[in-house]
């Protein structure tokens, strides 16, 4: 090619010489520009003339983004897991690790939260293959043979059945076990303790072991009858209490991770004896983490847990003997992971996380707040829509990050009000504990006027513009858009300082006026979550502007400490979030009205009874139109009672180095599924 270019250039020069010899001489210098296919500009003096031959510019070579270490992935987050016990962990930091170190019977078909592929089961049960009975009450799973746990022991059907039996019997209202007890033991049964005697010992780890031994054995045997292993035929059968449409989705999450019975027993867990299960009931994460059961993992998954140093890092190593030989979906991974080491670093300050990402020392980070998006955009060179396969350059195409945006999420952050603040052992979050200007009484939020005032005093528009940067959608209901029961025109509270003042002036405690006395309390959030911090600060600003004696102190707590105080009902009000476990409205109304959040908020019995009737009816109703009407009733009562200040929904954003490949979004999947990913 170079010889050809030289020949063309030479002919052009000769032609110019001939023309120059024939033409009359001119006093001025004539410049003729000829663009040819060459590699540089050449100036040639011929007969007093300069002939400039200009090369066609070569295209600028695109900047390459290559990782200095494609075998190691560094994710920088804020906050630790609560525990690694699969039966108890119920938060994203832990669940994301569990789904990498363990396997479930079935798993999501990549992005789809309602379509499933076999994992430790050899097929997904259905009516067509006989895995689901005609009445919808019996689910039979064929268990995969030849799978080994990380310690080299063999997976058996007995391990599978034991995993679910142990989970339900260990129970605990702070655990995810309600997702299994409802379909297997009966709608509305949120904890196995409710079946023991009159149910009064449910949630009480001290009282339940003292219940009648025969009654305890009866409940244990009932639970065991609901999940039965057949080691000869390599099957496990679940017997449901009533048809339950979202049963398969329930098994695909982290609490469906299959454990070794032998390892659990050796690591401080229950051994399967119905005479002793009560001694392991609702232990709490602190007790579990003092044992290998909660501080380590031992599953069949694509990664093994090398170490967890709380407050510092989690390190995962590839399972080089991972059993998968066929991809779960088209183009999916098989065998050992491509990324050999995953390091999840715990760094509270966003500025430090950002600097690590900018320097290339991190592959991705948890941002912490939508308000930090503009700073992230400064170092973003490529913008992708929904997936990493639909991308275009940004205004700064040489920058190192890739932004994946506009993908749907199934989570929300709201403000939860505590009706009966726990003062046992003292409680600094409510100051003096009295309505004296230096605190609040423990029943502060039982007053409907106080709750409505707080809802009216929150500046929703400021939150949308300053924190969500205009990208949020106001949600009038806890049920998500597109679900049965969502109402776009449902009533909701809006920012109205006049109504806030009107309501708070009606609030009294023992004849003392809240407006006259003032108050002081603490709003808690998990440290590093700047979005939740700002929510608190907005409420703080608006209330103090209304009355300088209204003091809301916004306090950050490390994630495990925050969880413990939230679960113990110590916090008078909290900013917290929920990501759905299964894509169904029941998974929203249950925790918000009678489940996890409602218990932490100590909703009064008459209110929870009213909600429970609606929630239980909605769970079993099969007619979509009738089910929607039930949830419309729920929406109105939730608005009237205002136990929670409902905020906005936001589409997702993920920032990562441009050498990262293979990430996908499944809106119910916690954490990052590194097994499908690789680095260039």
Predicted regions and their residues:
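Bacterial N-terminal signal peptides that target proteins for export
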Residues: 1-9
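Extracytoplasmic/periplasmic ligand-capture domains
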Residues: 4-5, 14, 22-25, 30, ...
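Bacterial N-terminal signal peptides
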Residues: 10-18
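N-terminal lobe/hinge region of extracytoplasmic solute-binding protein
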Residues: 74-132, 298
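Glycine-rich (often Gly-Gly/Gly-Pro-rich) flexible segments and glycine-rich loop motifs
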Residues: 222-229, 241, 245, 257-261, ...
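A C-terminal, polar beta->alpha supersecondary segment
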Residues: 260, 268-283, 656-680
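Active-site-proximal polar cores
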Residues: 647
């Amino acid at each position: 090619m170079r010889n050809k270019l030289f020949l063309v250039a030479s002919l052009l020069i000769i032609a110019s010489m001939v023309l120059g010899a024939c033409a009359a001489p001119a006093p001025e210098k004539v410049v003729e520009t000829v663009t040819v296919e060459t590699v540089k500009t050449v100036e040639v003096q011929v007969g007093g003339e300069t002939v400039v031959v200009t090369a066609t510019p070569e295209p600028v070579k695109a900047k390459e983004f290559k990782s200095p270490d494609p075998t190691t992935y560094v994710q920088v987050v804020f906050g630790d897991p609560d525990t690694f016990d699969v039966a108890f962990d119920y938060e994203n930091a832990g669940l994301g690790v569990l789904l990498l170190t363990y396997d479930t019977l079935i798993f999501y078909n990549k992005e789809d939260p309602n379509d499933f592929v076999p994992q430790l089961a050899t097929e997904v049960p259905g009516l067509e293959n006989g895995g689901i009975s005609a009445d919808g009450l019996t689910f039979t799973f064929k268990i995969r043979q030849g799978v080994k746990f990380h310690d080299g022991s063999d997976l058996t059907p007995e391990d599978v059945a034991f995993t679910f039996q142990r989970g339900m019997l260990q129970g605990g209202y702070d655990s995810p076990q309600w997702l299994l007890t409802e379909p297997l033991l009966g709608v509305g049964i949120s904890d196995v303790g409710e079946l023991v005697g009159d149910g009064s010992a449910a949630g009480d780890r001290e009282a339940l072991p003292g219940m009648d031994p025969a009654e305890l054995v009866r409940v244990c045997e009932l639970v065991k009858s609901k999940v039965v292993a057949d080691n000869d035929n390599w099957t496990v059968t679940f017997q449901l209490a009533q048809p339950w449409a979202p049963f398969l989705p329930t098994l695909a999450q982290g609490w469906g991770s299959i454990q070794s019975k032998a390892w659990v027993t050796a690591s401080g867990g229950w051994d399967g004896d119905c005479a002793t299960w009560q001694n392991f009931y609702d232990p709490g994460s602190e007790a579990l983490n003092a044992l290998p059961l909660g501080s380590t993992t031992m599953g069949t998954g694509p990664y093994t847990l090398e170490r967890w140093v709380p407050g510092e890092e989690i390190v995962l190593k590839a399972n080089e003997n991972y059993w998968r030989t066929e991809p779960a979906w088209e183009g999916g991974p098989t065998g050992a992971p491509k990324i050999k080491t995953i390091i999840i670093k715990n760094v509270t300050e966003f500025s430090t996380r950002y600097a690590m990402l900018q320097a290339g020392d991190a592959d991705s980070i948890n941002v912490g707040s939508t308000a930090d998006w503009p700073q992230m955009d400064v170092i973003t060179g490529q913008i992708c829509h929904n997936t990493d396969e639909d991308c275009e350059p940004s205004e700064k195409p040489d920058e190192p990050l890739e932004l994946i945006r506009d993908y749907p999420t199934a989570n929300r952050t709201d403000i939860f009000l505590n009706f009966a603040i726990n003062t046992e052992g003292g409680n600094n979050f409510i100051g003096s504990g009295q309505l004296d200007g230096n605190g609040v009484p423990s029943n502060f939020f039982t007053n409907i006027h106080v709750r409505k005032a707080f809802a009216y005093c929150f500046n929703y528009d400021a939150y949308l513009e300053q924190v969500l940067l205009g990208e949020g959608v106001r949600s009038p209901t806890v049920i998500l858009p597109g679900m049965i029961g969502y109402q776009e025109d449902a009533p909701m509270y809006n920012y109205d300082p006049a109504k806030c003042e009107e309501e708070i002036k009606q609030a009294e405690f023992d004849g003392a006026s809240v407006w006259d006395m003032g108050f002081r309390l603490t709003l808690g959030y998990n440290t590093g979550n700047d979005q939740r911090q700002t929510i608190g600060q907005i409420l703080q600003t608006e209330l103090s502007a209304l009355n300088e004696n209204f003091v809301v102190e916004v306090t950050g707590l490390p994630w495990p400490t925050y969880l413990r105080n939230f679960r113990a009902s110590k916090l008078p009000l909290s900013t917290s979030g929920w990501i759905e476990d299964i894509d169904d409205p029941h998974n929203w109304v249950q925790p918000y009205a009678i489940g996890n959040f409602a218990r932490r908020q100590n909703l009064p019995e008459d209110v929870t009874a009213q909600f429970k009737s609606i929630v239980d009816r909605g769970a079993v109703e099969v007619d979509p139109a009738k089910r929607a009407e039930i949830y419309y009733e729920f929406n109105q009562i939730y608005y009237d009672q205002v136990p929670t200040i409902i905020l906005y929904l936001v589409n997702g954003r993920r920032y990562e180095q441009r050498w990262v490949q293979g990430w996908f979004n499944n809106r119910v999947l916690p954490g990052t599924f590194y097994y499908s990913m690789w680095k260039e």
